[in-house]
Amino acid sequence: MAAKVEPFWKRKTLDRLDAEEWESLCDGCGLCCLQKLEDEEDGSVYYTRIACRLLDLETCRCRDYANRRRSVPDCIQLTPAQAGEFQWLPPTCAYRLLAEGEDLPLWHPLVCGDPQAVHRERISRAGRMLSESAVAEDDWEEHLIFRAG
């Protein structure tokens, strides 16, 4: 009987993942592509339901992922070197969970095999976001949905 091999995210630290493994950790929720506001007093990060102009509001995927940083220069590219700073990511985010020593949730596509589970379980904001082009930046505070961390 062959020994059961643990999935890569249980066997490797974030800094040991190859590019394909790293990218596959993204569950496609799109939450990291929502506009965020930082409380100037305590540094808390609040997510809004205002999405980056490149985010498809239904699929929660970037419409130009390969070139996103050209179109949106302040788009944040997550790297293993930043793992200690992932507290601003949603508490359901695989990058944050693994950086904090947690496992992936049952609905994560790598666990259940279904990329639509993140939407069915309503982890993503599919269909419940607004494009940043539709809301004045001064009005973003009216669209807060949760606090990270």
Curated annotation (Swiss-Prot):
Residue ranges of the TM segments: none
Superkingdom classification of source: Bacteria
UniProt xrefs under Pfam families: CxxCxxCC
PANTHER family: UPF0260 PROTEIN YCGN
Similarity field: Belongs to the UPF0260 family.
Name assigned to this protein: UPF0260 protein Avin_32930
Organism listed in the record: Azotobacter vinelandii (strain DJ / ATCC BAA-1303)
